[in-house]
């Protein structure tokens, strides 16, 4: 079977969704700039050999509608001979894009793919136009469509305290701020034009949503937002609302080597799994277990892990049940996570994978895992290997 490898991976800075640096930049532009960036960074690649552009996006309406993958690829000047498709596995959409490209390569259905994802949550809100079938209430708990309440439920089931959640959130901001100051995001962030608070055009080079001043005291002052009477989940322990895109160049290994392109990581295994929609945040556990089994390794073999931080109350039960509580500081989300950086839905899968690969290089690690929960009860996971 042919091997799928990551040749390059980049992301935009994460902009605040409310009056942020990308308030005047469309989702297609964020996407197209990254596509162009991948080609500029890898001049050995002939764009005419691109088989397909696979782009994750959840809210496929307004500027994100009508196959944003194709719209963005045309804006980027990618040859019209390349295909383009937009995929939607909710929060796991751009990781699904990785998986689709990898499967195509492994089965001989192409050797060069641009993949990624985008979500401009400032322009297209998460709940825009949502209309669940009334009959779903016969099959799943009513709260299953309310992500914050699913986090409350998962946290309660696993005995996660408010203080544990607050500490996890503080760590996320501290780690992300340190990564910014120390330049550890420099290799993955691709500068994008945006606007400062006064409306002046600027090149955005850093994430806008990190709050380095976050403390246990400031978080303790926040009220529970999803269950005001009995809850523990606050805005401060939830993923921030942000706008952003991420992108990867995924190729068949021998083709990349023949062109003299770098092999930054090989896709070792992939998995998706379902779980109870009422505790959708638990999805990374069964997905990770499947991916590890397919890779023939155990969780102890992993050097670095990126677990998407939808909520602290969701992340901590997954860490606990995967047997990773003792290695959080050494292995998990070492540059912070979505609580600090935000979770632009369609962008996040490739974003955490990009951060993971850069961390693996920084630490000279061999095996890494990227995994995330998915609304309505799914998980997705990818094991990467440096070769």
From Swiss-Prot:
Enzyme class name: transferase
Gene Ontology terms for molecular function: acetyl-CoA C-acyltransferase activity
GO CC annotation: cytoplasm
PROSITE patterns: THIOLASE_1 (PS00098), THIOLASE_2 (PS00737), THIOLASE_3 (PS00099)
InterPro entries hit by this protein: FadA (IPR012805), Thiolase (IPR002155), Thiolase-like (IPR016039), Thiolase-like_sf_Thiolase (IPR050215), Thiolase_acyl_enz_int_AS (IPR020615), Thiolase_AS (IPR020610), Thiolase_C (IPR020617), Thiolase_CS (IPR020613)
Catalytic site: 91, 343, 373
Compartments in which it is found: Cytoplasm
Function statement: Catalyzes the final step of fatty acid oxidation in which acetyl-CoA is released and the CoA ester of a fatty acid two carbons shorter is formed.
Family the entry assigns: Belongs to the thiolase-like superfamily. Thiolase family.
Protein name: 3-ketoacyl-CoA thiolase
Organism: Shewanella sp. (strain ANA-3)
Gene: fadA
């Amino acid at each position: 079977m042919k091997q799928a490898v990551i040749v390059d991976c980049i992301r935009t800075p994460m902009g605040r969704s409310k009056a942020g640096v990308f308030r005047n930049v469309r989702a297609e532009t964020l996407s197209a700039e990254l596509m162009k960036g991948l080609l500029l960074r890898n001049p050995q690649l002939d764009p005419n050999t691109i088989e397909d552009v696979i782009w994750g996006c959840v809210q496929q309406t307004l500027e994100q509608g009508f196959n944003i993958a194709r719209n963005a690829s045309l804006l980027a000047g990618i040859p019209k001979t390349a295909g383009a498709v937009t995929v939607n596995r909710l929060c796991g959409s751009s990781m699904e894009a990785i998986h689709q490209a990898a499967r195509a390569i492994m089965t001989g259905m192409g050797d060069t793919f641009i993949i990624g994802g985008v979500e401009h949550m400032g322009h297209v809100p998460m709940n825009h136009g949502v209309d669940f079938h009334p009959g779903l209430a016969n099959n799943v708990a009513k709260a299953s469509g309310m992500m914050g309440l699913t986090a409350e439920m998962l946290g309660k089931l696993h005995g996660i305290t408010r203080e544990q959640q607050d500490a996890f959130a503080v760590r996320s901001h501290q780690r992300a701020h340190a990564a910014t100051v120390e330049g550890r995001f420099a290799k993955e962030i691709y500068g994008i034009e945006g606007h400062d608070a006064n409306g002046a055009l600027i090149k955005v080079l850093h994430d806008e949503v990190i709050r380095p001043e976050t403390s246990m005291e400031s978080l303790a002052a926040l009220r529970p937002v999803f269950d005001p009477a009995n809850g523990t989940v606050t805005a401060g322990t939830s993923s921030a609302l942000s706008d952003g895109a991420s992108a990867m160049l995924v190729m068949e290994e021998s083709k990349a080597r023949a062109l003299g392109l770098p092999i930054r990581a090989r896709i070792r295994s992939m998995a998706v799994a379902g779980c109870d929609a009422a505790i959708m945040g638990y999805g990374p556990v069964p997905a990770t277990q499947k991916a590890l089994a397919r890779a023939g390794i155990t969780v102890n073999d992993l050097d670095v892990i990126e677990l998407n931080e939808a909520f602290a109350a969701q992340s901590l039960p997954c860490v606990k049940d995967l047997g990773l509580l003792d290695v959080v500081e050494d292995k998990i989300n070492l540059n912070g996570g979505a609580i600090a950086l935000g979770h632009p839905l369609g962008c996040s899968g490739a974003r955490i994978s990009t951060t993971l690969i850069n961390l693996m290089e920084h630490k000279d690690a061999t095996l890494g895992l990227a995994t995330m929960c998915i609304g309505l009860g799914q998980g997705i996971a990818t094991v990467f290997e440096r070769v």
